């Protein structure tokens, strides 16, 4: 089962992709937002899918970001040794943390806005981890209790802004 959101930008509704079809869950769930995950929404969703006859999403509907605007998107740069070597960078001794704007989320087929004066726009397919509830000082043994799921994330960066102008990576 895959979570989807469909409809016009800014007016997406929650749904699921199951067995090759998209189903509308908007009669049962407000959205896939932080409160959905914090209130055991995935568990409730399983019950709804098993018990209800769900309407199909009409063909041709735009597919949006599967998660409604999260509070933050945290990223780790050069997160594995092979990638650091590919870029010619030294392997970091400490994780390189930076953030992405939540307003930059798009659907899988939406246009991506490239910054004016962009010189080195780059993209990478990343595995995103969706944290389902607030966490602080969580042990490694407990970490998976906080993971709600995973998303494929097309990470688009402007490398000249990010790496050649100094400062933090956030601006890239």
Can you name each region flagged by the protein language model?
Residues 1-95:
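N-terminal non-catalytic cap/leader segment that marks the start of a structured domain
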């Amino acid at each position: 089962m895959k979570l989807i959101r469909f409809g016009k930008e800014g007016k997406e509704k929650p749904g699921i992709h199951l067995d090759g079809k998209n189903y509308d869950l908007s009669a049962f769930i407000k959205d896939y937002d932080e409160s959905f995950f914090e209130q055991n929404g995935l568990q409730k969703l399983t019950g709804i899918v098993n018990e209800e006859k769900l309407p199909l999403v009409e063909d041709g509907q735009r597919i949006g970001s599967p998660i409604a605007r999260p509070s933050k998107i945290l990223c780790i740069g050069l997160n594995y040794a092979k990638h650091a070597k590919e870029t010619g960078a030294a392997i970091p001794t400490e994780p390189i943390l930076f953030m992405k704007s939540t307003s930059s989320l798009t659907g899988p087929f939406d246009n991506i806005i490239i910054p004016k004066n962009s010189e080195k726009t780059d993209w990478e397919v990343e595995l995103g981890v969706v944290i389902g509830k607030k966490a602080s000082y969580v042990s490694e043994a407990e970490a998976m209790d906080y993971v709600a799921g995973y998303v494929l994330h097309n990470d688009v960066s402007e490398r000249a802004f990010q790496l050649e102008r100094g400062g933090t990576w956030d601006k890239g």
